[in-house]
């Protein structure tokens, strides 16, 4: 049977030591917060207070140091390599920036990732990367990122980059932001809320419907932050591709239940995260 590849996304992995911790619990993907300084340089992998219930909000690294740790965890011949870690979502905390700094943020982000993660195109980390942007007005971050990789001689690395607007905006508004950014694929659509609060699945279902329609812009849908078995089952029943969680082992447990193991499998590196799954 054709099973939907599933991404178990470890939430708020902001210290290098947490990469091992979350992957060992079953995550094949992690989400990392990126804060910016006043000149739009990516500065720390830091969330800050408040954050999810039951989590420490203040773990951090310098962004470039984190990229090096992540590179080691995703480079096949490295002693820190995790074969199953195949995707990272950078949750870009651009709320501290003016709208007109978005292009610069994208440019500086690209330079950091190119140097410290991709090793300037020389046997760097292999994980796919989703740039997750909280504000539709900051779509030029994507433009800045793309133009910088191109001008720095590595346009091919855009094959490894996907996109997400994480503000729970109306699906139509997200579509027009992508149009402005010139994005025509590699789209992950998030929906969710902190684990301290409850959120229904109506917008998730709308995103799934867009993904599965012939003219939708979405390739993958993920839901955050899910820590309980019941809400995991509800999200899987709604047809999501990814679940972001503080407890990867809980999601892995549910995926191993017979009802779900018949329909889902844990995604591997061979699963293209930019491809819409067709049943």
Curated annotation (Swiss-Prot):
One of its GO terms (biological process) is lipid catabolic process. Its cofactor is Mg(2+). Expressed by the venom gland. GO terms for cellular component: extracellular region. Binds 1 Mg(2+) ion per subunit. InterPro entries: PLC-like_Pdiesterase_TIM-brl. Keywords: Cytolysis, Dermonecrotic toxin, Disulfide bond, Hemolysis, Lipid degradation, Lipid metabolism, Lyase, Magnesium, Metal-binding, Secreted, Toxin. This is Dermonecrotic toxin LbSicTox-alphaIB1a. The lineage of its organism: Eukaryota, Metazoa, Ecdysozoa, Arthropoda, Chelicerata.
């Amino acid at each position: 049977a054709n099973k939907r590849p599933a991404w178990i996304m470890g939430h708020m992995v902001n210290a290098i030591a947490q990469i091992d911790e979350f992957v060992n619990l079953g995550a094949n993907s992690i989400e990392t917060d990126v804060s910016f300084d006043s000149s739009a340089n990516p500065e720390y992998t830091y969330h800050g207070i408040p954050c999810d219930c039951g989590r420490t909000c203040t773990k951090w690294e310098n962004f470039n140091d984190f990229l090096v740790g992540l590179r080691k965890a995703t480079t096949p011949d490295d002693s820190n390599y995790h074969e199953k870690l195949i995707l990272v979502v950078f949750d870009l905390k651009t709320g501290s920036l003016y709208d007109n700094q978005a292009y610069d943020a994208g440019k500086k982000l690209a330079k950091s990732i190119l140097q410290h993660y991709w090793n300037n195109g020389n046997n760097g980390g292999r994980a796919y990367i989703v740039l997750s942007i909280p504000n539709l007005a900051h779509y030029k971050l994507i433009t800045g990122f793309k133009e910088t990789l191109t001008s720095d001689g590595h346009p091919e690395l855009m094959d490894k980059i996907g996109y997400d607007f994480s503000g729970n905006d109306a699906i139509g508004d997200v579509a027009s932001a992508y149009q402005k950014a010139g994005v025509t694929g590699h789209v992950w659509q998030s929906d969710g809320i902190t684990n301290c609060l409850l959120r229904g699945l109506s917008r998730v279902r709308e995103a799934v419907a867009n993904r599965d329609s012939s003219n939708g812009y979405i390739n993958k849908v993920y839901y955050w932050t899910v820590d309980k078995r019941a809400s995991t089952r509800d999200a899987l029943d709604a047809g999501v591709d990814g679940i972001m969680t503080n407890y990867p082992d809980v999601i892995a447990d549910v995926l191993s239940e017979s009802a779900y193991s018949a329909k889902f499998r844990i995604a591997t590196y061979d699963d293209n995260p930019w491809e819409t799954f067709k049943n």
